[in-house]
Amino acid sequence: MYIVIVTMRTILFFGIFFIFIFQCAKCIELKIFEDLLEVRSQSGLFFPLCSKSFHQKYGEQACASISSTFLSYSTVSLQQYTYSVGCTTSVCFTFLSSFCKTGVKVFCSPSLCASGTLQIGSKCLSISTVPVQGYSEANYYCNPATLISSLKPTEIESIRDTILPTFADTRLFLTSGLRQGATWKWGNGDTVEQEVTGTGRCLALQAGNLVAIDCDSEAYVFCESGRECIARDKEYSGTANRTSDGKMCLMWNDPTVLFRRERDLEILNHNFCRFVNDADGKKSATPVCYTKPNELSQCYIPPCPESFNDVVPIESGDSCPIGSISCDNGSKCISEKFQCDYEVDCNDGSDEHNCEDYLQYYELIGAYRLADNIIEVWTFIPHVQGCARKCRESLLMCEAFSYEPKSQTCLLTDTSQTFSSLARKITSLYYRRRFSTKDVEFQVENKVLYATKSAKKGHVCDDNYSREKLSSICRVLGFGDPIYTVESHQSESSLGPLQPTTLHPTNPSFDSPSSVSQMRRTSPSATLAPRLPAWNLSCLREPNCTSTVISTCEPIRCSHCQQAACGDGSCIRFDQLCNGQIDCQSGEDEDYCRANSFRLTNGSDTSGYLEVLFRSRWEPICADHLNGKISNSICDAMRLGEHGFILSTNATISSGYNVNCDVDCSIRRSSSCTRHARISCISQNGMSSASQCGLRYVEVNARDAAKSRIARVVGGFETVPGAFPWTAALRNKATKAHHCGASILDKTHLITAAHCFEEDERVSSYEVVVGDWDNNQTDGNEQIFYLQRIHFYPLYKDIFSHDIAILEIPYPGIEFNEYAQPICLPSKDFVYTPGRQCVVSGWGSMGLRYAERLQAALIPIINRFDCVNSSQIYSSMSRSAFCAGYLEGGIDSCQGDSGGPFACRREDGAFVLAGVISWGDGCAQKKQPGIYTMVAPYLSWISAIINGQPV
């Protein structure tokens, strides 16, 4: 690579470079080889430059060719010919110097930027030679470099003065900046501090100003490469890929490296030298890379000069705003959330100093990915330590997690017995929580679980854990089923009140250590246990916790039984539980025979074969003793209607459970079952629950992709009144302007997207309109309500995950008619099958304006892999979201449709709410389909809100 210099003015071409001296007509080419300055002869070969022809400007120009600055030179004796330089008034030329045997060694400063890039401030930049089409192509163009990030005002000024004058003022240069809600963020997570003008979700530089543009816009690209030197905070992100002894580096994601490496290293799709942490968490002395599957070798990268560290201290007297901290060197303020997230944000790395090793609490099980029983999904987690931290800080008793470095996705689960919920995946790591130190010993004595840690022995406290939790603890430690006694699980009539007293029986996911389905009942007259040393489970998991507590807590009791245990530790079969016969000496096998949850299988959402959840197992219900009263109670418990119609059945079973629902529903096992119960749930007005929701009185077929394009719901069609009666509008109360869509759930609740309220969360700012069709005219069918409350999903932070909210309006609420109807909720096991076509509806943007009349479109669910690969921006899609639309463009939901329904038709004709319109990049553009929040994963939360339960 060489630099072109014309009349002493440097002109940068991104590609091939030459050195011209004086004028283009009189030019020579120079390069440095092993510190020796060489000149190109007329034959095209390079030879050492004779020391007598050397001038300092030659050294400066040669160092510039490797993006360095000239420091000094020295002469050196040679055993070969050299070449000299001669110049006339019009041309310079080279000639052989037969008698000159001394050359010149040139010493340059460290390489700051790779050849082909230009140093601007602390950045190494290059510019695309051709425009690219959109954000996704821009990222692809820059790879393995990245789109420019964290532009400082001084850097923008330098770009404006040195680069932009050669381009038209209208030219756009894409950066890594993206709008996330109301905030602009650079690709590295930093907040954009400068003012941004224009509309759009992507950030570009135009004539020295930051402007917002559509992410599909054609633009040129500023690519930012890593510095070819080591910053003083031991950071290197350059492109050196050879070791100090010249060996080529292997790819970090080479399969032989992945399978044989000992350290927990980041999986990278390149072979560049990088700093890594050793087994003690200390950063390596130099950048390294793999040259063999199990051999890390050092790379030589020079240190950056002090001026290139680009540290600008915070002005004296300034302080960081609330919620931020200052880097140790005072270079900048960062969010407190970025501290110890295992991603360096401070130039000196101080935000990651003295951070806890969260992985010490977990053991690596293998290359698996959670596929079920997921309680939380976190995206943009840059390191597995961050995922471990999320699990440790989870309020939902996280027991294990899987982490995918490539997608930076973290999945949490509340159970450690998850092998049935795991899928093999080589790029994912599955960790399970462990007891914190290897010197913790567990044993069972007299049916009581004891722990010994730091030579201190005590029983392990049962902190009101659920039956499922206790079972997990006992079995993970290698013991059998937990032991329950009649004393701790007496009949309800002899005990004090249950706390809490409300829990919906169809929501086992709401079960907590104090839930009614798992309640540890305590008799007011019970004798307190003696005060003995005891361990809390949380303390056993803490490396630094070594103190027992003097506690009256009930101990955890474990058996050695594989199926079920009596209170005295004797073992029984599972089918001996709740069978009407006392098999345990104290009768505890017939205690706690309550039915907590029912479900329907092999049918529709409102009819099918009955099963009951008992001891974490779904068991069949016998048809033999089922009557109308019991089926009514079961349907009511499942919220599928007030009446249960018993259907004929041909399914035979040898054993199952009989149900009795006098007060609460209890069960008894029967070994004389002949048929599996099958029912259909019916409402008070004689219609099935399916007829209560998702119905419409006007039949309109949504158009498919073959129809001509009509601007949006883009590419859809204009409906007629009552066509999609569950579609509601959220409007600005003052201006009556359309704001977002929503869907009717019941008389007082609607569901929408949480991001609709990012700018203003005040309920007084909005009103809800149902039964509308033309929002510019009064149809006479509208019902208008003010908002009483907005319920955000607890984990919602921004548009990219958990983008769902429930609106509450005052009682008595909506009057249902042919223009206003609730939509059905999907079943918990609703499958988002690629290719399934469903309907979106709303009054959102039609490209140039909002629609006056309700629009609708039929669009298919898109395979997640195809969606993510259609555009880089879709890597932001969370696991609780899905993609729908057409990759070729033309039909989609758009601005103003957010919060509206993605409705799928069931076999019985009713519509279910499969998704909530969330976000997208552009409207109906090629390779930019819409993103929708799944509804099925949030059913428990939705039920809790509707039923007024705590969440």
From Swiss-Prot:
Where does the source fall among the domains of life? Eukaryota
| InterPro entries linked to this entry | C-type_lectin-like/link_sf, CTDL_fold, Kringle, Kringle-like, Kringle_sf, LDL_receptor-like_sf, LDLR_class-A_CS, LDrepeatLR_classA_rpt
Which GO BP terms, alphabetically? axon regeneration; larval development; positive regulation of gonad development; positive regulation of MAPK cascade; positive regulation of nematode pharyngeal pumping; protein destabilization; proteolysis
Annotated keywords: Disulfide bond, Glycoprotein, Hydrolase, Kringle, Protease, Repeat, Secreted, Serine protease, Signal
UniProt family annotation = Belongs to the peptidase S1 family.
Q: Which residues form the LDL-receptor class A domain?
A: 319-356, 557-594
Function of this protein?
Serine protease which ensures proper pharyngeal pumping during larval growth by regulating the levels of extracellular matrix component fbl-1. Independently of its enzymatic activity and probably by acting as a ligand for tyrosine-protein kinase receptor svh-2, involved in axon regeneration after injury by promoting the generation of productive and stable growth cones. May play a role in gonad development.
Q: What is known of its domains?
A: The Kringle domain is dispensable for larval growth and axon regeneration after injury. The PAN domain is required to maintain gonad structure and thus fertility. Dispensable for larval growth.
Q: Which residues are glycosylated?
A: N241, N329, N464, N536, N544, N602, N650, N776, N869
| Tissue expression notes | Specifically expressed in ADL sensory neurons.
Q: Where in the cell is it found?
A: Secreted
Which residue range or ranges hold the SRCR domain?
Answer: 433-585, 598-694
Q: Where is the signal peptide?
A: 1-27
Query: Could you tell me which species this protein originates from?
Result: Caenorhabditis elegans
- Domain named Kringle: residues: 234-304
PAN domain: residues covered: 355-435
Asked if the Swiss-Prot or TrEMBL record annotates the protein with the keyword NADP, the reply is: no
Molecular-function GO terms, alphabetical: serine-type endopeptidase activity
Spell out the PROSITE patterns in the cross-references. LDLRA_1, LDLRA_2, PAN, SRCR_2, TRYPSIN_DOM, TRYPSIN_HIS, TRYPSIN_SER
Disulphide bridges, residue numbers? C320-C333, C327-C346, C340-C355, C387-C410, C391-C398, C461-C571, C474-C584, C545-C561, C558-C571, C566-C584, C578-C593, C622-C681, C635-C693, C661-C673, C740-C756, C838-C904, C867-C883, C894-C923
Query: What GO cellular-component annotations does this UniProt entry give?
Result: extracellular space; membrane
Query: Could you tell me what this protein is called?
Result: Serine protease svh-1
Which EC number(s) does UniProt give? Answer: 3.4.21.-
